[in-house]
Design a protein with these regions (language model features):
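Contiguous beta-strand/loop segments that form the cofactor/metal-binding neighborhood of enzyme cores
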Residues: 2-7, 191, 197-282, 316-328
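N-terminal Rossmann-like dinucleotide-binding module
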Residues: 1-63
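Conserved SAM-binding strand-loop segment of SAM-dependent methyltransferases
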Residues: 65-72
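Active-site loop of classical SDR/Rossmann-like NAD(P)-dependent oxidoreductases
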Residues: 29, 51, 307-319
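Predominantly a Rossmann-like dinucleotide-binding segment in NAD(P)-dependent oxidoreductases
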Residues: 143-226, 230-232, 356
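Beta-strand-loop-alpha-helix segment that lines the small-molecule cofactor/substrate pocket
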Residues: 82-83, 94-144, 159
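C-terminal helix-rich "cap/oligomerization" subdomain common to oxidoreductases
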Residues: 1-17, 83-86, 285, 321-364
Length: 364
């Protein structure tokens, strides 16, 4: 199979710089992922604001952003800003979006961070506010734009793997917990596992029920309940999915040798795909990988490769899908409305682990 036949990167129109982007936040994910990808894609960033204006000024100088605002409320007044890109902790994001919708005369789209909110009820409120204001809301579920993940989705959509039977993700990696995560009622489930849960939805659709188990991470010193997460998803068509989200990985920071990495696998009735995820090597930009084999071509593995990496290149896809949606007046694939089902799944996993029981998705 020729690499050019695999839909591993979203196709974008060439005139998306017609939209002015305003950025709220100046942390590393904005500085080193969002803005790097936007520069490479030719998107037009008009201004930036942060609760730390000095850091916003540093990022603006580094990434060529013309205007630094002392407060995001000043940024919202600029009529040349049609798109808001939010990069703030999840507990602060809903309040900012409630203010953004008051500027619907010129604001046409919002790219929110994941999780959209820390509860289904609040996420639903935000989605409905944006819909009422006529503002297109997208949620930055950027794992969908990891190139191996998107490539696997293409294989599934084209039927090359047949009917999905089993999907697994085996994560042995150490996230960099930000200080703001100490204030959340959930750590790994809403911050880390949400990537894999949304990925399973992207590949297989919505599950009927879930089972989960969790325990604290020995390395993380602040109080939390959900560090290491184990969970199983059951789908109506018989497909099953499971992830081991191991943020401990053994005492590798405490003196032992390490075995860090993320491997995924999708088995179907007509083929098998497997891959690796490159982000544990960050800040080294390491492309993810995809190998697959089918019953029709059973004598070898096909191994398409690419130079792009999840960090930063996937962020071209999330902002690009929002800009395309605004331009063509269509819902983005990562719409806020769709993301409610991801939030429901995350809450179901958290509940299943907390209450030690099977949770049906309609409960949420």
């Amino acid at each position: 199979m020729n690499l050019l036949d695999l839909d591993y990167e979203v196709a974008l129109d060439q005139d998306l710089n017609q939209f002015g982007i305003g950025v709220i936040g100046a942390g590393f994910i904005i500085r080193d992922c969002h803005l790097v990808a936007y520069q490479q894609a030719g998107f037009r960033v008009v201004g930036i604001a942060s609760r730390n204006p000095a850091r916003a000024a540093e990022v603006a100088l580094l990434r060529g952003i013309p205007t630094v605002y002392q407060h995001y409320r000043e940024l919202l007044k600029n009529p040349d800003i049609q798109i808001l890109d939010i990069g703030v902790p999840p507990q602060h994001q809903p309040a900012i979006i409630r203010e953004i919708v008051q500027h619907a005369k010129h604001v046409r789209g919002i790219l929110a961070q994941k999780p959209l909110a820390m509860s289904y009820a609040e996420a639903q409120e935000i989605v409905e506010l944006c819909e009422s204001a006529g503002i297109t809301l997208a949620v930055n579920q950027n794992m969908r734009h990891d190139h191996s993940v998107r490539g696997c989705r293409d294989l599934l959509q084209r039927g090359l793997l047949g009917e999905p039977v089993l999907g697994t993700i085996d994560m042995r990696a150490i996230p960099h917990w930000m200080p703001w995560s100490q204030d959340l009622h959930s750590l790994s489930t809403f911050v880390m596992s949400i990537h894999h849960l949304d990925c399973f939805r992207y590949w297989f659709g919505d599950p009927q029920r879930v089972m989960a188990s969790t325990r604290p991470d020995p390395r993380t010193k602040f109080s939390h309940t959900d560090g290491i997460n184990l969970y199983i998803l059951e789908f109506a068509n018989g497909c099953r999915a499971s992830s081991w989200d191991d943020v401990w990985t053994g005492p590798v920071r405490e003196g032992s040798q390490g075995d860090i990495g993320i491997h995924w696998r999708v088995e179907g009735t007509a083929g098998l795909a497997r891959g690796t995820i490159g982000w544990p090597s960050y800040p080294a930009a390491t492309p993810s990988t995809l190998d697959f084999t089918t019953r029709e071509r059973g004598d070898y593995w096909l191994q398409p490769r690419w130079k792009q990496a999840w960090f930063p290149d996937a962020f071209r896809g999330t902002m690009g899908e929002l800009l395309m949606a605004v331009k063509h007046q269509t819902p983005p694939p990562i719409s806020g409305r769709d993301n409610l089902r991801t939030i429901a799944l995350v809450e179901a996993i958290f509940t299943a682990a907390k209450e030690h029981r099977v949770v049906e998705l309609p409960e949420i």
